[in-house]
Every structure is written in C-alpha cells, then in structure tokens.
C-alpha cells in the first residue's frame, strides 16, 4: 500500500560489506529454542543467510518446500525473506520476487492478503490454502525491505529507491548461492503501489549489474530477468497528481467532486503542484526541492481530495472504515508459536514509519521513474503495468496515462492501439492492450490490492507476463 512518504535518490557509494570478511562460503546448522536453522555465509558478498526449512506455516501442500529467515546484507542489517517453491514443477518453473510498497510496508501483505500460498477467509483466525496463489505457477520469493519493515530489523541506511536496489540485489546473490538450482531460471520482479518506484529501479539495477558482470567489472551471478509487473503503481507524480483530480470527478463507482471542483483543482495543480514538481524533475533533483514538492502537492491536491467524501482511498466503492482486505494476518504473525516456527526474530510491523521517513526526508516520492521504466521496456523484457479500477490512491487513470507516456521505440504504436476486453475463461475481467513486450491492463472491480479482489484475473496476467508473453484473453 502507498503511505506516501518523501524520498531522495542518492547513489550508494562503495561496496556492501558485512561486519566480518568471509574468506570462503560456510554452511552450518544450529538449534535455537527448539527451532533448527541453516546458516550460510556468502564469501563473495559478505552476506549471512539464516533460515528455517519447511516450517509448516502457510504452505501446507504436500511436497512443496518453503524457507523463511534472514539475510544480513550489511552491518546490523537483517532483511527478512520467505520463499515458497512452485506447487508444480519447481525445478523448471520460473522464479519471481514480490515487493509491497509504502515506502516502508511489508511484503507479508502480499503474501497473506494477495497472491501467497495461504489467505484468511470467512473470518477465520488461521489461514487456508489459496487456490490462486502465484506459486501454482512460479517459485515465489517475498522480501521485507528496507530494514525495519515487516520482520526485517537492524540499522537502516536506505533513504531512497536508488539506495534500496543494491541491498535487494545482494540478497538475491546470496540466495542463488544457497539455492543454485534456481540461478538459471527465468526471473521476474512483481510489485505494487510504491513499487512503481521500486520495480523499474530494481529491474534497471539488476540489468546494469548483469552488464557489469558480463564485462568483468563486477563479480556475481547473472540474473535472468525476463519480466517486470507493477499494479497500481506510483511512477510519475506530475501525471498521477492530475489523475487524482480526474478520477475523483470521473470514475465508474463514486463521483467525489463536481465539474466546478475539478476546474478549481486543475488550476491549483497548474499553479502550485506542477511548478513545485518541476523543481524536482529527475533523480538528480535536490532533496529539499523534492521534499517541498511532496508537501505542496499533498496539501493542495492529494490531501483535500482524499477527504472529498467518506470513501476508502484503496477502494472507492467502500467507506473509509472498510475492513477489507482483512487484517487478520497481522494478529496471526504476532503469535509466538508462529514466529518461532518461521524463524522470525523481531515483532512484525506492517508499515514502518521510521523506514518511510527516511524516504520522506529525501523527497523520493516526488521523483519520476518514467524514464527508468522506459529504459526497462526498451531492454526487451516483458513489462506489465496494470491497475484495479476501484483504487483511488494509485488509480488506473494515472496508470494508463503513465503507460502511454513511456518513451520507447513503439510508443506511438502503443498509444494508438485500442483497448480490448480481457477475459479469463470467457469471463470479462478488464481492458488491455499489448504492443511487443509492453502491456497495459485495467482490472474491473478491483481495489488497490488487485490479486485480493480479482484473483483469477491476477493469476492469468501474472502467468502470461512471467511466461514472456503479451497479455491475451482466454
């Protein structure tokens, strides 16, 4: 979910090192309070991986392995991960990572509320298997980042999307060394909300590291990146602040403002928000200018519009106290019996104010990732930008305009391609268009967390994108 903190993109100087240098890979097994851990120390990156095998929590499908634990990505920096093998053919299935947004929100949201192996239904206090889990098709890796989010704990030097990327890459490098059977598999990055920042930047960083490894200027495992998917993402503030106005006036569910209000807000956008954003035009914009832009645009556009009626910003069809998706999983993850089994060492925090404030101080939210997204599309990997049409906070009008604004060799063809009905087994699920390796999808009847509201549509879109295909109806 998007909690809208301000961030700045600062280059990460120097290499990432752990507290003590490791001369060669080491693997050991330890028992703590009745829980067995595998400990792996990665010589190349100095990372330390510590995890529990087959906890019996969440994924209970017979024969499907799971691993949960921590990667120490730096001094006192312990990043939480939870990995589930595919339910079908894990030795050949692709590998995908999932990141929730914030910035500063846990990927356990996605695991338990959206696309993970288990979910909570009908008010149950314990989870049941999710038949639409994305691990029916792919091996799935959920990561809590930056430090301080979810079960991750320790010191957090990350204050921007750009500074977050190397730590995620480092985790993946250690993961591949511990689980080398997956390193040659097709790999995808899937994310939502502030993932409109995370997704393009992480993909671009991984591709740049691949090039450095190929040229010999860096060492590591080549990541076979084939796909990027971002639903209800926050990519470009100039486009998407205007979309707050347009969507509030014209959506299929709940008109929030009238024509006069729309005109007034549009004038305010042109006179205050847009000029402030102009001062923060790229990742090289100053922290103060970008932070100021976020403050101005929130006060003049987002804040007032979010109070334009009694509605849930994540699902405009519902009142502000909307109880869905249910937060039952948070109570479940505070159970000492559960945390012991999965190897968690900290108290679960769904969204971390401190992690988000780091981004806030650098104005990261006000920086556009549109050009980075264009570079990723131009690289040739399969890219899906999609959105549930009942979400307000990162609404589909903004997402659609972002998709059309992406600069790449087939931009004109993409802009001029008509939308078509997207069906799942003949049932209408939305509107889409695909040109070469780039797709847009509007999902009917879905709020911010698309896989929760429309799991069948989400699973099909995921499979097609991860399978290096453009979207197509079935």
Predicted features, each with a name:
Residues 2-474:
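Terminal and linker regions of secretory-pathway proteins
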């Amino acid at each position: 979910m998007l909690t809208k903190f301000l961030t700045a993109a600062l280059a990460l100087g120097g290499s990432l090192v752990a507290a003590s240098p490791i001369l060669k890979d080491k693997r050991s097994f330890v028992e703590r309070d009745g829980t067995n851990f595998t400990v792996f120390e990665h010589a190349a990156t100095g990372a330390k991986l510590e995890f529990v095998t087959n906890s019996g929590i969440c994924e209970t499908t017979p024969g499907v392995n799971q691993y949960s634990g921590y990667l120490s990505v730096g001094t006192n920096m312990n990043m939480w991960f939870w990995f589930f093998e595919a339910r079908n053919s894990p030795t050949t299935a692709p590998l995908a990572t999932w990141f929730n947004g914030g910035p500063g929100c846990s990927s356990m949201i996605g695991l338990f509320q959206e696309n993970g192996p288990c979910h909570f239904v009908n008010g149950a206090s314990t989870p049941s298997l999710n038949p639409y889990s994305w691990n029916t098709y792919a091996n799935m890796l959920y990561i809590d980042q930056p430090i301080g989010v979810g079960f991750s704990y320790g010191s957090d030097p990350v204050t921007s999307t750009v500074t977050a990327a190397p730590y995620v890459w480092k985790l993946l490098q250690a993961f591949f060394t511990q689980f080398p059977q997956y390193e040659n598999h097709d790999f995808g990055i899937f994310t939502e909300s502030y993932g409109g920042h995370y997704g393009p930047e992480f993909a671009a960083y991984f591709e740049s590291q691949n090039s450095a490894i190929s040229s010999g200027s860096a060492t590591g495992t080549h990541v076979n990146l084939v796909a990027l998917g971002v639903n209800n993402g926050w990519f470009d503030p100039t486009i998407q602040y205007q979309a707050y106005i347009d969507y509030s006036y014209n959506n299929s569910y709940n008109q929030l403002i009238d024509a006069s209000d729309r005109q007034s807000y549009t004038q305010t956008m042109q006179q205050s928000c847009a000029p402030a954003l102009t001062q923060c035009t790229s990742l090289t914009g100053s922290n103060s200018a970008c932070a100021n832009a976020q403050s101005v645009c929130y006060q003049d556009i987002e804040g007032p519009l979010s109070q334009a009626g009694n509605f849930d910003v994540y699902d405009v069809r519902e009142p502000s106290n909307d109880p869905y998706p249910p937060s039952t999983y948070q109570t479940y993850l505070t159970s000492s019996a559960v945390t012991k089994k999965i190897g968690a060492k900290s108290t679960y925090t769904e969204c971390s104010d401190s992690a988000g404030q780091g981004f806030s101080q650098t104005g990261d939210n006000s920086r556009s990732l549109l050009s980075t997204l264009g570079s990723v599309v131009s690289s040739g990997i399969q890219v899906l930008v999609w959105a549930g049409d009942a979400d307000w906070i990162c609404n589909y009008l903004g997402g659609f305009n972002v998709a059309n604004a992406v600069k790449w060799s087939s931009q004109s063809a993409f802009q001029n391609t008509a939308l078509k009905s997207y069906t799942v087994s003949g049932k209408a699920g939305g509107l889409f268009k695909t040109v070469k390796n780039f797709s847009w999808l509007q999902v009917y009847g879905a709020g911010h967390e698309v896989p929760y509201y429309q799991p069948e549509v989400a699973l099909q879109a995921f499979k097609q994108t991860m399978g290096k295909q453009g979207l197509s109806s079935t």
